[in-house]
A protein has these predicted regions:
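Conserved class I S-adenosyl-L-methionine
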Residues: 1-59, 155-177
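Class I SAM-dependent methyltransferase SAM/SAH-binding core
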Residues: 66, 72-118
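A short acidic, Gly/Pro-enriched loop at the edge of an enzyme's catalytic core
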Residues: 121-128
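Residues lining the SAM
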Residues: 131-133, 157
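A short, conserved alpha-helix within the catalytic core of class I
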Residues: 136-149
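Short alpha-helix
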Residues: 184-200, 204-206
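Conserved Class I S-adenosyl-L-methionine
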Residues: 204-266
Length: 266
């Protein structure tokens, strides 16, 4: 297979949105996304990605980090415990507002709103170029740009497996499969790894597996389900039966893939 075929594998079938449409989509999701991630019952700093950074000594106090699609700044906050020279970029200004508040005590923190491909063109500007779950990286040219602006490492994180038993119960009730979540697009990692390899680098891959208790609301579930009005009413009634004090308790079975590569062969 040639490298362009891996690019097609990496890309989803979703239609391409205009930049201004993407901004509105993520602005509208920002409050829900912030509340959902902040209330997760997990010690985020214990995630494998941060253990890799520490064990491999990828960063020091003088390192410069760029987080592409930084969202509300969860990863930046952890990186700031090692270095204060952190930059977050996102298409959503509202997401960045949450990140700015979270990182308000980090004097060197910078936040750049807009299209990262337009805003970051300087060669070897950062020690680590990082991206987690972002749709902003889907082409060979995006990966090439990451390598260009990094002087040392590039690192990406992506869900490759996700299960929620409550969603499975909804599927059983409806007698059909629900729409595939973005988090279950494991072919993305397959395409990404092969593109990086074909570009001449030597990517390492790690798997972060965990089960976490999760507390969700009816809105959390409904925002991620595509259904008819009739099905919507059935799902709402079903979820009401699961609710206790407005909360629905479940478990998430998660596997995240982490790909790390050094832009310097030696």
């Amino acid at each position: 297979m040639n490298i362009e075929e891996f690019e097609k594998i990496m890309q989803r079938d979703d239609k391409e949105e205009k930049e201004e449409d993407l901004e509105k989509i993520w602005d509208d999701k920002s409050e829900w996304f912030f509340k959902r991630t902040e209330k997760k019952q997990e010690n985020f700093s214990d995630r494998l990605i941060f253990k890799i950074v520490k064990e491999k000594k990828l960063l020091n106090e003088n390192s410069k980090v760029l987080d592409i699609g930084c969202g509300t700044g969860r990863h930046l906050l952890e990186f700031s415990k090692i270095t204060s020279h952190i930059t977050g970029t996102d298409i959503s200004s509202r997401m960045l507002d949450y990140a700015k508040e979270k990182l308000k005590n980090v004097n060197e923190a910078k936040f750049i709103h807009g299209n990262w491909m337009k805003n970051f063109t300087k060669e070897k500007e950062f020690d680590l170029v990082f991206a987690s779950m972002t749709p902003a990286i889907s082409k060979i040219e995006h990966i090439n740009r990451m390598c260009l602006i990094s002087k040392n490492y590039c690192m990406m994180e992506r869900f490759v497996y996700y299960r929620d038993p409550v969603r499975e119960e909804i599927e059983k009730m409806l007698g059909r499969k629900l729409n595939k979540l973005h988090s279950n697009h494991k072919d993305y990692i397959y395409g990404l790894w092969n593109i990086v390899w074909n570009l001449g680098y030597f990517p390492e891959i790690y798997l972060d597996k965990y089960i976490s208790e999760t507390e969700k609301t009816m809105i959390d579930y409904m925002k991620q389900i595509i259904c008819t009005d009739e099905e919507k009413n059935k799902i709402i009634e079903f979820l009401k039966g699961k609710e206790k004090n407005g909360k629905i308790m479940s478990k998430e079975y998660v596997i995240k893939a982490i790909i790390l590569w050094d832009v310097n062969i030696f």
